[in-house]
């Protein structure tokens, strides 16, 4: 006697979770595939396949899984963000920027989407444009050094010494190691570091 679909789905989900726990990603992918046989639009299975194939470097498969997931859940900001991250990793900057912008349109407070958009803009040498998402990222994540570091680098590359100095001084208050790295890169000195 075959299990009803909800029980089978639960069973496959549990088996996939155990496989992940024991680092058997190949088997986990098989169980997620079985979940898709029951429901081709299962968001958990699609997201899990996308993440696992991306981690294995199987980018096209991951991208296809994210696309399928977004066909089912078009307003999933996380999926758009992750798709953007994957596209940036594949050097498809315009697609990455579009995905990050879509994530931000859905969730304006998605700090990582702002950061991802900024990194894509920096990679495309669109430094002036990168300032807006960097400033939003540092507002949303004021204690994360990554946005501040990139903001200082962009300000420095744009020749804005005063703004770079302000960011460097701010960063030195809570992340002196990163501030010292910026000192080496910019030639500026943080007023709060000895």
What do these predicted ranges mean?
Residues 8-44, 48-55:
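Alpha-helical segment of the N-proximal tetratricopeptide repeat
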Residues 8-9, 43-44, 77-78, 111-112, ...:
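Helix-start (N-cap) detector for alpha-helical repeat units in TPR-like alpha-solenoids
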């Amino acid at each position: 006697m075959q299990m009803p679909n909800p029980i089978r789905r639960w069973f496959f989900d549990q088996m996939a979770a155990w496989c992940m726990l024991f680092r058997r990603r190949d088997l986990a992918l098989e169980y997620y595939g079985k979940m898709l046989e029951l429901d081709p639009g299962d968001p958990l299975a699609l997201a899990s396949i996308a993440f696992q194939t991306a981690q294995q470097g199987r980018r096209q498969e991951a991208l296809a899984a994210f696309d399928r997931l977004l066909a089912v859940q078009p307003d999933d900001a996380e999926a758009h963000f992750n798709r953007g991250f994957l596209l940036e990793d594949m050097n498809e900057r315009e697609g990455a920027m579009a995905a990050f912008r879509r994530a931000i349109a859905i969730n304006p407070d998605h700090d990582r989407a702002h950061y991802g958009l900024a990194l894509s803009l920096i990679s495309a040498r669109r430094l002036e444009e990168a300032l807006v998402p960097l400033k939003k990222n540092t507002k949303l994540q004021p204690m994360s050094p990554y946005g501040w570091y990139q903001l200082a680098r962009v300000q420095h590359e744009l020749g804005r010494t005063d703004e770079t100095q302000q960011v460097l001084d701010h960063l030195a208050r809570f992340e002196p190691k990163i501030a010292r790295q910026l000192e080496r890169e910019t030639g500026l000195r943080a007023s709060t570091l000895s």
